[in-house]
Amino acid sequence: MLRNSAKPQLKEASRLKSIYFMTWRWHFYAGLFVIPFMLMLSLTGSVMLFDDEIELARYEATLQVSPQEQMVPVSAQLETVKQAYPDFNVTQFVPAKTADIANRFSIQNQEGSSLIVAVNPYTGNVQGTIDRGDSIYELMNSIHGTLLIGDLGDRLIEIAASLGILLLVSGLYLWVPRDNASRAGFLKIRFNNGPRILMRDLHANLGGVLSIVLLFFLISGLSWAGIWGAKMVQAWNTFPTYYTWGEKPESTLTHKDLNHGASEEMPWNLELAAVPESKDKPAHDHANMKEEMAYAGSHDALSIDDIILKAEMLGFTGYKLFLPRSETGVYTVAANSMGGDISDPRQDRTSHFDQYSGRLLVDVTWQDYSLFAKFMAAGVSLHQGDVSVFNKVLNVVFCLAFILISITGVVMWWIRRPSRSATLGAPPKFQQDGIWKLGLVTLVILCLAFPMGGLAIVKVLALDWLLFNRVEKLKTALN
């Protein structure tokens, strides 16, 4: 009787052991791909958190001003910029957030070069320029988003972030205690049990405790990705133009086109929506239509001072003001957490004004956002460390923790790998009777929810079946 009752227990123990090692193998192979990207994202993200501080340190002489009682009208500052840079088009005005910092005007030329012109608001004098292409933030943001190789880099990062969620789910399964051995290290750091146990405790407990934080960063980051972000969730959360725009005519210009370089200046849920057009142009103006980037402004258009007054009457304080880019273009005033204009996403606002009459064409606020758009608006503020100094410091701590989790994972593998052997040192593989249904369902859900990660998993499984298991040297090296 004892022997017969022991058989099911042994079989169940064998099944659980097989599942554990299978999960560990998935965790291991996903980690091989994800860890380099996790290190890159954490390092570049840490630098981007201090964009304002780095920029002020690099360009202190250009940006610093001495506060005075009277300010020069913004229209006069704009005219000074136009005269100083006749081959450039002024595209944006950003008022200084503090009294001792210069106002900024963004300018672009026909070749696409983009500069920031710093203007003393008290004297109206140009203090200097900042080349957007020379910005440390722009460089870090481009690496963070595309690895400097465009769409290919974007896709690789999206695969890494998607597999990062698989890494997280499998890691949680491995972390939850199931026997005395796993309970011994649960929520404990054992410093006296050797380097491998120490690395394991740091890796598992940090990863487990910060799993929700990591998931938040992965999801909010994926929302910018080219497939899951732009083609799926962003497309479904972009405003249908008829909802807010009504019968107002649309241009071919989207809100995303208003961004400068790698900077995300417009709200995420508006990026794919078209910008409305100005239609209140007086009939007597017979000026020829001009190309967007060559547009120098219409004599009948309202001055920038008029638009600023209207924006302030709506409640705008910190904001970016985008100038019309054609005779049918509009003045756009945007204050949003994604662009770093404000820290409270509930105060997000984007307003479009007819450049001739000043009529408010579109006014989009937090209340108009979808549920996921609200998550993005709030999430991006936290993601970028814009809410407070504490938020910024906390994000640095999180980045350092993610780096430590990645490094301890590599060290664990290095310690346990077979020495003097041409093998990868993957966790052992055990035969299993039947299919682990919960694991299969979880994997299918992740593949469907994050298609780039799913595509990568399908390719790996195909290679494993077609090549790795058929070539003995590869089979030995990878197992």
PLM region spans:
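Conserved histidines in hydrophobic membrane contexts and catalytic metal-binding motifs
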Residues: L2-N479
